[in-house]
Design a protein with these regions (language model features):
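Short, surface-exposed, charged amphipathic helix/loop patches that serve as local interaction elements
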Residues: 2-10, 14-16, 22-96
Length: 96
């Protein structure tokens, strides 16, 4: 199977820039893995890693809280991660 060129865009979130693979985000395979995350969390994590250009662990450590404070050694909170993923979805979703 031929490898497709991926469109990578920068998404701003709480004052920082993150590279996001727009092509991976639009993939049915990736979206299915995300939607089935409660049944297969590993597949959902792998899908997010594809969307985050292989840097999901780095991003978890870089996402600031609502107050702008950087996370500690455990990474961002689940609420901050959810806000980040929502911002990514809004930024890369097809516009009508």
């Amino acid at each position: 199977m031929e490898k497709k060129n991926h469109e990578v865009v920068q998404v701003g979130f709480r004052g920082q820039e993150f590279d996001v693979d727009k092509t991976a985000f639009a993939s049915l395979k990736v979206q299915t893995a995300l939607n089935l995350g409660d049944k297969d969390p590993r597949a959902a994590n792998e899908a997010m890693n594809l969307i985050c250009c292989g840097r999901v662990v780095e991003y978890i450590g870089r996402i600031p809280g609502e107050d702008g404070e950087m996370p500690d050694e455990l990474g961002c909170t689940s609420d901050d991660w959810q806000a980040f993923t929502s911002a990514v979805a809004e930024a890369v979703a097809p516009k009508n």
